Amino acid sequence: MQPTADQFTEKGWAAIVLAQQLAQQRKHQQLETEHLLLSLLQQNALAGRILEKAGVSIGNLQTAVEAHLQEQPTMQAAPDSVYLGKGVNDLLDQAEKHKQAFGDSFISIEHLLLALAGDNRCGRKLLNQAGVDAGKLKVAIDAVRGNQKVTDQNPEGTYESLEKYGRDLSAAAREGKLDPVIGRDDEIRRTIQILSRRTKNNPVLIGEPGVGKTAIVEGLAQRIVNGDVPAALQNRQLITLDMGALIAGAKYRGEFEERLKAVLKEVTASEGQIVLFIDEIHTVVGAGATGGAMDASNLLKPMLARGELRCIGATTLDEHRQHIEKDPALERRFQQVLVDQPTVQDTISILRGLKERYEVHHGVRIADNALVAAAVLSSRYIADRFLPDKAIDLMDESAARLKMEITSKPEEIDEIDRKIVQLEMEKLSLGRESDSVSKERLEKLERELAELAEQQSALNAQWQQEKGAIDDLSSLKEEIERVQLQVEQAKRSYDLNKAAELEYGTLAGLQKQLSEKETALAQDGEAGDKSLLREEVTEDDIADVIAKWTGIPVAKLVQSEMEKLLGLEAELHQRVIGQEQAVQAVADAIQRSRAGLSDPNRPIASFLFLGPTGVGKTELSKALASQLFDSEAALVRIDMSEYMEKHSVSRLIGAPPGYVGYEAGGQLTEAVRRRPYAVILFDEVEKAHQDVFNVMLQILDDGRVTDGQGRTVDFTNTVLILTSNIGSQSILDLGGDDSQYREMERRVHDALHAHFRPEFLNRLDETIIFHSLRREELRQIVALQVNRLRERLCDRKLGLEISDTAADWLANAGYDPVYGARPLKRAIQRELETPIAKSILAGLYGDSQIVHVDVDVDQERLSFR
């Protein structure tokens, strides 16, 4: 027959074209069967799969074909075209007959292979030498093709569909590749119950991301392998479908549907032996539906309803609502299994079950208190994720961090290495000097270097020894895990002799070795010097990782931090002059929180600062942020004068769905989601619209609020400070006189109750009245402001000395009880900073000069020299 492209599949025709090219490259006049065989071996993955299934070594067969081609006569130059040899013509006729026998529409790779197995020229001989005949080849082809027919020019995509587009969870469970599943018995039992139904036997696991939906299916796979399931599920194969692989590369319309149909056909043909698992099942809705093609869900529906296909789905609550509930016909074919977040206690049990796997992987030990800390701390401080996923991640990252420390050079050795390099450089420099002082220093250096080298050698030996001991433990744990898997496999295959031999012989011996090594390592740690390496993850490691993730300091207080917290009040007083009550209240709240005594379901503290302008309300907030986070940038400042309209509430928590800006989120909620540990300042709160306070009620009482997108934002690690000028006139009129303090306080509270609702005021921890500033306090503020100016002048290499009389003069010039410290700031700018700036620009001050400031009594202004 004269071959044409429309008689062959795409891959079949490509094999013939490549065979022609191979004949030309080798300067052969005729295209023969050996060229076609080499073409199939070189290019075609399907031919290779079939031959490997038949037990052929592809490399050896290719070498044999190459050797046969070397023996063929060649031309002096490559021919322009090659002719079909008689052998190829006969082979193509045979391939046509095989096509008809299979009931196919096109000649494909498998027909060409079968024809080669009957080729009298060389194909049969070469294949027989490789250990395969037509019979074996037919069996291998049936195994690869299954029940598929060649009905188009690209049928290879439908062969071995499950192998290509799925992952066998049962095989993974048999090989011990799946993590153990702890608990979740109710959900697994309900899943088995639904799978055992006659029709609509399709459970869908619905739950928040990270609660363990996929783990439930893995647990089911382990139960099937262990035979711990009803008869309806005994010896079933659980395969997870990879929707990404199914869609990837499906270029032409209808190609995706063909692949999916092939998968479903294989599942149906298994007559219930295969259970399909589709993770993220919402992706089947609309998948592949381009250019008017049917989507995957419409292909699944008929089979799901008839019970021909057992399918387990998994998706989140939101995705289920958005995609699957919109298609009631698909939704009714699945039976819902709701998967709730486990409790902290259940999470601890899950972590204990997984602990061994993570210990073996990282080569470290994980203390039980670390597991408890991972569950408890993640539940408390990581609000936007779910247990057990966030607790497992914590444990994993803490173990990875410790492993990194073990494999890195210890700090003690690194310091000595750096010191040796530094001294070696100094030694080289001194070696060039000939004076007696340099020689003496050189001798001293050499002695120091010798001591350091000795220390380095001892520490390196200790490090290698400790590292070796930890590596030995890790290897033993890996070996124990491997033997445990062999024991399980032997028990499953009822090889009880082997199981007993491994369990009571090999495994018992390994566990004894492990126990001895762990005891020896612990004793060395207690008896010997300080260890360079730690090999156990503790609760402190977990706390450090949480702090890195969220910025919330949850680690145990070290001595330096305790001292810092005890001195917090004094530190705040250095920046905020006067206002004893306010500073003490703020410091007390922070100390309660860091000691772990504050209510975990409310913000750390919430204050309302009242007082006239310029007395330090905002400054105290900045000072607190600076003390807690070493930066004023950690202060989330919200100017409430921007929230005077009713609709501006949406700016705080985010616009509702359907409004412009819905995706952007709220200014307050987004700031706290990114930085959960913060000082939040609501400045001039009386200017906000009353509806803004409705949002704040929830924050003040429960420490949480729901943003425009329905996410819960946690405020339990924030300090809320609200400032207001309400009642400031009463404070100014009566605040200076101690005898009238009670009257002033009463008037301020009356003004407060007139403006704010009782339920808002009742939720605040404390309402603090800031007094108007006295002259002596202004004098201290002058000293503060002058120190700040001195620091700025230091950058220009200038000093500043100001006399007491000049400081008093500035305090008087800036004194205004109505406006607080702000007029003082303006007076310092006008009388002190501006003249100094002009003198610098005029070149009157050089480097390292000191600017002396005094008072010119005659002209009533400051003098500079």
Curated annotation (Swiss-Prot):
**MF GO annotations:** ATP binding; ATP hydrolysis activity
**Pfam families registered for this protein in UniProt:** AAA, AAA_2, AAA_lid_9, Clp_N, ClpB_D2-small
Q: Which GO terms describe its biological process?
A: cellular response to heat; protein refolding
Q: Where is this region: NBD2?
A: 561-772
Q: Where is the Clp R domain?
A: 5-147
This protein's GO CC annotations: cytoplasm
Q: Region entry Repeat 2: which residue ranges?
A: 84-147
Renumbered residue ranges of the record's region Repeat 1: 8-72
Give the location in the cell. Answer: Cytoplasm
Question: Region entry Linker: which residue ranges?
Answer: 342-551
What's the superkingdom here? Bacteria
Annotated binding of ATP 2, by residue: G611, P612, T613, G614, V615, G616, K617, T618
The ranges of region (C-terminal) come to 773-865
PROSITE patterns from the entry? CLP_R, CLPAB_1, CLPAB_2
Q: Which CDD domains match?
A: AAA (cd00009), RecA-like_ClpB_Hsp104-like (cd19499)
List cystine links.
Answer: none
Q: Which positions are tagged coiled coil?
A: 392-526
The record describes its quaternary structure and partners as:
Homohexamer. The oligomerization is ATP-dependent.
**The family this protein is said to belong to:** Belongs to the ClpA/ClpB family.
Q: What does this protein do, in the record's words?
A: Part of a stress-induced multi-chaperone system, it is involved in the recovery of the cell from heat-induced damage, in cooperation with DnaK, DnaJ and GrpE. Acts before DnaK, in the processing of protein aggregates. Protein binding stimulates the ATPase activity; ATP hydrolysis unfolds the denatured protein aggregates, which probably helps expose new hydrophobic binding sites on the surface of ClpB-bound aggregates, contributing to the solubilization and refolding of denatured protein aggregates by DnaK.
Free-text comment on this protein's domains from its UniProt entry = The Clp repeat (R) domain probably functions as a substrate-discriminating domain, recruiting aggregated proteins to the ClpB hexamer and/or stabilizing bound proteins. The NBD2 domain is responsible for oligomerization, whereas the NBD1 domain stabilizes the hexamer probably in an ATP-dependent manner. The movement of the coiled-coil domain is essential for ClpB ability to rescue proteins from an aggregated state, probably by pulling apart large aggregated proteins, which are bound between the coiled-coils motifs of adjacent ClpB subunits in the functional hexamer.
Q: Which NCBIfam families match?
A: chaperone_ClpB
Matching entries from PANTHER family are given as: ATP-DEPENDENT CLP PROTEASE, HEAT SHOCK PROTEIN 104
The protein's name: Chaperone protein ClpB
